Amino acid sequence: MVNLYAATKQAYRSILRYYIETANLKVINLELFDTYGPNDQRGKLFALLDRLRTSGDTLAMSPGDQQLDPVYIDDVSEAFIAAFKRLRSDVVQDEETYSVRSQNPIKLKDLVKTYEDATSSTLNIEWGGRPYRAREVMVPWSRGETLPGWSSTVTLQEGIKRILDSDV
């Protein structure tokens, strides 16, 4: 099966490489991990947890041992600003690639527990009610270099609090 998302990322890198070589373009690639924040319309994990909390529905999930590395949107924005400043400083020779991650991976089960603690709720989750997906990533890739001058500062607990505060 062809993964079109991966194919478009590879095509982007090839086109970018062409312009780096022919137009002396300077580039910083930021590889984003799981991002989250208030008003996220993508239907990602935190929106799902919030829906479960307010509806009381039960959700069958995997056993929950896969790890996630969520990065709050404000930290992602700061990474883009740091990358821009690095490009402006003329230290980038051609292309640099950095990982934008919290550096604090957490198991899905533990993330849900953190969410429950932050919301003073208990979600109706049937852990192990469905199998892991084919090719489930159990541990996020962690060998990418961190952008100089940047680190994630918003903890998971603080990020969840900010999401909840934005709903008021």
What is the predicted role of each segment?
Residues 1-8, 36:
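Catalytic loop of short-chain dehydrogenase/reductase
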Residues 34-35, 58-61, 68, 80, ...:
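A recurrent short beta-strand within the Rossmann-like NAD(P)-dependent oxidoreductase core
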Residues 144-145:
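Hydrophobic/aromatic residues within transmembrane alpha-helices
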Residues 94-98, 109-112, 120-141:
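C-terminal "lid/loop" region of Rossmann-like NAD(P)-dependent oxidoreductases
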Residues 3, 40, 44, 68-74, ...:
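Residue-level signal for the nucleotide or nucleotide-sugar donor/cofactor binding architecture
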Residues 155-168:
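Amphipathic terminal alpha-helices
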Residues 10, 14-68, 73-77, 81-84, ...:
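NAD(P)-dependent short-chain dehydrogenase/reductase
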Residues 45, 107-119, 159:
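PAPS/PAP-binding and catalytic site of the sulfotransferase fold
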